[in-house]
């Protein structure tokens, strides 16, 4: 993580100046080489543990995505961030108005150098009213909201909190997908490759509400494969599936048809233990 951040910080200044530098070229080559060696070494050591392999691959890639994407430059991210900020104030009402640290401005930062210059602490914040908070269910913003709240308690600057929330969303995605890969008895490689879709990583490394929703859908498919291969379905399995259905229903019910695959395990319901 430290290597990723250091490399991105240096490259940000080079990119903003748009001047060729042999040092920058060498850094890019070395940075890329380290990544390749790291991936090869981890793959050789842990190719039988696809779930852990996913975690170790996704962490540096996800963090790179997270810092390369400037704040609010992911589609609709400003509305998602404002909703998460509202949740961090322990306000779960569906309203559009939220007071945010005055350092915040929609697409305010125009360069990567500005991002790193805005990291730090702010012990005397002032607040400005914004009116673009999304109206999605509070459940999808709970994890980044908690991270934002923790950042405010520690008096971190607005954009330090911003990236802390992004990191929390990324951690949620990595955790859920890793568990999904772990429990599925088959198609582990398919899950692994699918979750490295660049558009999916972009959502996971931002405030997008689709991050937790898609993660829940991936878990739902993996859990179906787990139950389909299981001899007897237990009561706890029914509770987990019902919880996933309720979550999807409350957050984005258009994804509910995905649970139609569970008709494939209905015969096993006669053997609930």
Question: Where are the model-predicted features located?
Answer:
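Start-transfer (signal-anchor) and selected internal transmembrane alpha helices
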Residues: 13-64, 273
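Interfacial juxtamembrane loops and adjacent helix segments
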Residues: 88-164
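Short acidic/glycine- and proline-prone juxtamembrane loop motifs at membrane-interface regions
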Residues: 206-213
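Membrane-interface alpha helices of multi-pass inner-membrane proteins
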Residues: 201-202, 237-253, 258-264
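Transmembrane-helix signature of polytopic, membrane-embedded enzymes
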Residues: 48-49, 156-159, 177-198
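Transmembrane-helix motifs of polytopic, lipid-linked glycan transferases
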Residues: 36-41, 146, 160-187, 219
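Specific aromatic-rich, kink-prone transmembrane helix
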Residues: 179, 213-230, 244-245
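Perimembrane helix-loop-helix junctions
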Residues: 223-232, 258-273
């Amino acid at each position: 993580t430290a290597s990723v951040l250091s490399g991105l910080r240096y490259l940000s200044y080079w990119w903003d100046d748009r001047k060729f530098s042999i040092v920058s070229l060498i850094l890019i080559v070395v940075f890329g080489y380290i990544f390749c060696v790291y991936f090869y070494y981890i793959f050789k050591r842990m190719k039988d543990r696809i779930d852990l392999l996913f975690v170790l691959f996704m962490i540096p890639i996800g963090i790179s995505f997270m810092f390369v994407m400037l704040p609010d430059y992911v589609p609709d991210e400003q509305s998602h961030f404002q909703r998460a900020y509202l949740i961090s104030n322990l306000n779960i009402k569906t309203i559009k108005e939220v007071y945010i640290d005055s350092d915040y401005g929609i697409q305010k930062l125009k360069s990567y150098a500005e991002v790193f210059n805005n990291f730090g602490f702010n012990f005397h914040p002032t607040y400005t009213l914004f009116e673009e908070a999304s109206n999605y269910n509070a459940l999808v913003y709970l994890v980044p909201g908690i991270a934002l709240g923790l950042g405010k308690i520690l008096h971190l600057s607005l954009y330090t909190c911003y990236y802390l929330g992004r990191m929390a969303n990324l951690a949620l995605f990595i955790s859920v997908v890793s568990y999904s890969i772990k429990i599925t008895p088959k198609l582990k490689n398919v899950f692994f490759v699918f979750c490295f879709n660049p558009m999916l990583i972009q959502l996971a490394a931002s405030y997008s509400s689709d991050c937790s929703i898609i993660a829940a859908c991936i878990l739902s498919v993996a859990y179906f494969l787990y139950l389909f291969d299981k001899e007897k379905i237990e009561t706890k399995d029914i509770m987990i599936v019902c919880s996933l259905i309720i979550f999807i229903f409350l957050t984005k019910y258009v994804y509910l048809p995905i649970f139609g695959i569970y008709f494939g395990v209905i015969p096993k319901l006669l053997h609930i233990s």
